[in-house]
Amino acid sequence: MSETHLSTKKFADFPLHKEVQQALNEVGFEFCTPIQALSLPILLAKKDIAGQAQTGTGKTLAFLVATFNHLLTEAAPTERKINQPRAIIMAPTRELAIQIAKDANLLAKHTGLKVGIVYGGEGYEAQRKVLDKGIDILIGTTGRIIDYVRQGVIDVSAIQAVVLDEADRMFDLGFIKDIRFLFRRMPDAKSRLNMLFSATLSMKVQELAYDHMNEPEKVEIAPNEKTSKNIKEEIFYPSMEEKMPLLLSLLEEDWPEKAIVFSNTKHSCEKVWSWLEGDGHRVGLLTGDVPQKKRLRILEQFTSGDIDVLVATDVAARGLHIADVSHVYNYDLPDDCEDYVHRIGRTGRAGQKGVSVSFACEEYALNLPAIESYIQHSIPVTSYDSEALLDDIPAPKRIHRKPSSHSRNSRDRSGSRPQGGHRGNAPRRHDKTRRHS
């Protein structure tokens, strides 16, 4: 975590339970991020908050520290049953729930509190067996939580702490009825510690907060900056014919450590994947059609570095929290302005630098004015030399509806990246620059 992303406030400055502080010390967290420094004094005073913060600001640790501290300093309800968790953390996607659970388990090490995670798509019986043993903190997606509530596997009537993460995405994905269903089955808002976090505190999000929370205090981090200053943005105006050669050429020139390429449709993503795979890149594909087990495997490979480039639609990428993404490429400009912010927010996180490259082609260039109006600044335009684009691009690989998770056809060339790189051991083809300032 970069020091430019941290405040001068230390976790040790707060009256945290000794086991929470011990866990923080062991994982190396000493200084708070701004959202942690602002929210923890409120939460430790047992007051509710509605926090506005982008992903990568440290909000997850803020609400986890508050949740663990609350459960360790408050007595459990008398006659609490084994199927009654004490805290519930709701997330819009499986991937976000999984990441929250990983972070929660780091804090749970010395506390004796049990963490359980539930999400749709797989593992129904396995997840149920964990719940049957009893848990203190339930983390999951609303649909699967409701399934277990309706079956009596989970009873939320003893909840002492509630977290709603990425509330704006909950609205986008149509989960608000599910959330209200769960809130109505919990104890009164005044008897719980309630936390809501959202990238934007729109009127609908604030209405949800005031309906189901106890006079929450609003906490905002850089509300006027929709895009991070740590992200270098640029935009190209390629023709439809030069769009793919430009992408492949920029990947060759930028040689990003970890990149995500966004496209607007499943078909377009498959096309991009085919060209990158044919060119020998170690590339994964995430669309709504990818089965959950394969999706998790691809994400694990991307996180571990076995895949360098991930091609994804907006829906498939929602909730992704992957560290160290150096570049984001908008192969298509999104139709939704907020999607642009969410896309490029995958890079430049936790104080790191990132690069966002967008293509304004003939089909999607009309989306640009609305995007620039929404982010309140113009995206710098970069020109390129058509003659410098790669001209030895292999044919795309046929997808056969079962794309491999990474390249298996890397060409045998000695390379500048030992044990991998975008084309296995393949080096860059040449050092010609394609950008013109």
Swiss-Prot record:
**According to the UniProt entry, where does the motif Q motif sit in this chain?**
9-37
Motif DEAD box: which ranges? 165-168
Q: Which GO terms describe its molecular function?
A: ATP binding; ATP hydrolysis activity; RNA binding; RNA helicase activity
Stretches the record annotates as Disordered: 394-437
Per the annotation, which location comes first and is thus the protein's main one?
Answer: cytoplasm
Every copy of the Helicase C-terminal domain together lies at 243-390
What family is it from?
Belongs to the DEAD box helicase family. RhlB subfamily.
> How would you summarize the oligomeric state and partners of this protein?
Component of the RNA degradosome, which is a multiprotein complex involved in RNA processing and mRNA degradation.
**UniProt protein name:** ATP-dependent RNA helicase RhlB
Species for this entry: Shewanella piezotolerans (strain WP3 / JCM 13877)
